[in-house]
Amino acid sequence: MSIGPSMPLRLEKPEGIDLAQAARYFGARGGADAATQALLEKCAVPLLAAATPRAVWLEADLDSLTAAGILAGEDVAKHLEGCTAALLLAVTLGPGVDAQIRRAGVGDIAAGVASDALGSALAEQAAEAAEAELRQWAARQGKYLTGRYSPGYGDWPLAVQPLLAAALDTARRAGLCVTENNLLTPRKSITAILGVSDHPVRGHLAGCGHCVLRTRCEYRKRGITCASE
């Protein structure tokens, strides 16, 4: 099977942004108060208008991904246990969202932070929509998928981002690039891998101990987890 080629995935822009999720990214505890809700609603309109969601994906066998250096670390291997192949996925909201976040923050720090939270929520919505499309594709093939697993989870290093981007040809197909520090640009972008199997698989669910946000997580400070919200 080897790797690729990458293919575009059609994404429809949602009618709205998940404000509850954005409030959590914003740091609202126990739900947004009236002022926070109003701020998020106000900032959501121009941010959604600025979004141009795009996604690309490919299928590859695990041996080829390993040989390419993409499956570095033990945790991603655990996630792919029982799988015969994997899908690579990249999703981006486009440069307009980054620009809108910067505009919103000029002279209004709260609006900038709110817009950033909204962008994160919208990126997750786009990734969920892309994953749903891939699950439909897998079902037509009689296949099953694990959940998404992204660089930075567990010991899967961010250093694989350039390899993922190159395999998916994200610069040409989606305008998505990787900086010298292995960060994605546009910033509101997500890359991930999903295992493919002939039987139902769950994948390795990274708990709090593996989360890249564990040292600054607001949920952990409150003695709960994001999964419980």
Question: Across the structure, where does each feature detected by a protein language model lie?
Answer:
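Generic secondary-structure signature for well-ordered alpha-helical cores
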Residues: 45-52, 135, 139, 169, ...
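Short cysteine/histidine-rich metal-coordination sites, predominantly Zn2+-binding motifs
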Residues: 224-229
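Metal/cofactor-centered catalytic core regions of large enzymes
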Residues: 34, 74-78, 210, 215-216, ...
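Short conserved micro-motifs at the rims of enzyme active sites and ligand-binding pockets
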Residues: 101-102, 221-223
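Active-site helix-to-loop segments that bind/position phosphate- or nucleotide-bearing substrates
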Residues: 1-112
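Conserved mixed alpha/beta catalytic, RNA-binding, or beta-rich assembly cores of soluble enzyme
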Residues: 83-147
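Conserved active-site and cofactor/substrate-binding residues in soluble primary-metabolism enzymes
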Residues: 35-38, 42, 121, 125, ...
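Short terminal or interdomain "cap/linker" segment that borders an active site or interface and mediates
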Residues: 141-219
